[in-house]
Amino acid sequence: MSNFDFLKDEFIDLYELCLEAEKNCYIKPRTSAFYSRLALEFCVGLVYKFEKIQTSYNEMSLNDLINKKEFKDLFQDESQIAGLNLIRKFGNDAAHMLKNIISNADRNLSLNKDIALNCLKGIFDFTVWIAYCYGST
């Protein structure tokens, strides 16, 4: 049983990404943060699709998509966007270790279960919103 079972029927691909993030949260926090970011990308793509938000090829980074005015206007509170950006940043850290090693930054090496859990909570909240807004049930 998963906290994301509510996604199974209508958003199976999203469910599978979230399930990986959930399964790995305590045993492989880096993997969990990475899958939370992938789920975030999927969710943002769904919002753009369902809301028919236009974007150009030059605006295709996740950062650009999250911070685009038409996307941000869908949310009541700026803290919701800040939460999505944290998932994006920690997911980036999980995936891109080389830059941080070369620059001697320690933040990439400190991805722990607390960070993974915060990412997971954030993606859970976003997927509940996705299911509520765009699901049929």
Which residues does each predicted region cover?
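Hydrophobic alpha-helical packing segments in soluble, helical-rich domains
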Residues: P29-Q54
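Short, charged amphipathic alpha-helical segments flanked by flexible coils
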Residues: Y48-K89
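A ubiquitous short alpha-helical element
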Residues: M1-L7, K72-Q80, N108
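Amphipathic, well-ordered alpha-helical segments in soluble domains
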Residues: D13, L17, Y35-L38, F42, ...
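Charged alpha-helical initiation segments
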Residues: M1-R30
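Charge-enriched, short contiguous segments at helix-coil
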Residues: A33, E78-S136
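Conserved NTP-handling cores and scaffolds of large molecular machines
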Residues: C43, V47-E51, K69, D73, ...
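Short, charged/polar, low-complexity loop and linker segments
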Residues: E16-E20, S61-D73, H96-N104
